[in-house]
């Protein structure tokens, strides 16, 4: 595996998140319904847009991402963001899964008033993202300010017919979390 510095890896990961989750049209690529992009086309379009991108750099980002944000297709010809999409091009068909008793959501304290009114909503994304452990939720919340960890009564939600899915990187997904299922 080629050597890249942390800034280059972080910048490339952010770029991939942007085009594979939110704005593929920004560089002229099209994602299929499952979020897959042809790697050769991605590299070509990224380079045309002035972004240094190679297969070796992609391999390193995919292999070293602590959150496993990206995955390759079984034939190695396509790449996708595992979850977190806001683009209407993508509707990944995750398998429904029974959640553990509790899941966790990390947020910033400045968002609590709104959450107390409307619960957790997906916003521009397709799903609300939840963690199986508090440590991961804390890291997520810290990205946006002073972190607050909310406990989600996931099994209670599932018993009421609210579906959950789990992305291949372990992130739990659901469409919304009503206030009644949150513990502060």
Curated annotation (Swiss-Prot):
Annotated keywords: NAD, Transferase
Disulphide-bonded residues: none
Domain of life, source organism: Bacteria
Family matches, as InterPro entries: Ptrans_KptA/Tpt1 (IPR002745), RNA_2'-PTrans_C (IPR042081), RNA_2'-PTrans_KptA (IPR022928), RNA_2'-PTrans_N (IPR042080)
MF-aspect GO terms: NAD+ poly-ADP-ribosyltransferase activity; tRNA 2'-phosphotransferase activity
One of the Pfam families matching this protein, by short name: PTS_2-RNA
Xref: NCBIfam families: PRK00819.1-1 (NF002012), PRK00819.1-4 (NF002014)
Family: Belongs to the KptA/TPT1 family.
Identification of the protein by name: Probable RNA 2'-phosphotransferase
Species name: Escherichia coli (strain 55989 / EAEC)
């Amino acid at each position: 595996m080629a050597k890249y510095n942390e800034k280059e890896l972080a910048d490339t990961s952010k770029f991939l998140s942007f085009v594979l989750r939110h704005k593929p049209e920004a560089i002229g690529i099209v994602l299929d319904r499952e979020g897959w992009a042809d790697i050769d086309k991605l590299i070509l379009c990224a380079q045309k847009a002035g972004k240094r991108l190679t297969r070796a750099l992609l391999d390193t980002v995919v292999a070293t991402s602590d959150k496993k944000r990206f995955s390759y297709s079984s034939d190695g010809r396509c790449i996708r963001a595992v979850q977190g999409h806001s683009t209407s091009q993508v509707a990944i068909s995750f398998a429904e899964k029974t959640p553990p008793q509790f899941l966790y959501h990390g947020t910033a304290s400045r968002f609590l008033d709104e959450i107390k009114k409307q619960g957790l909503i997906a916003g521009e994304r397709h799903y609300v993202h939840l963690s199986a452990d508090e440590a991961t939720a804390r890291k997520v919340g810290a990205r946006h300010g002073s972190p607050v960890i909310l406990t989600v009564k996931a099994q209670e939600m599932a018993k009421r017919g609210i579906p959950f899915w789990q992305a291949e990187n372990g992130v739990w997904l659901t469409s919304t979390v009503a206030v009644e299922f949150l513990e502060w």
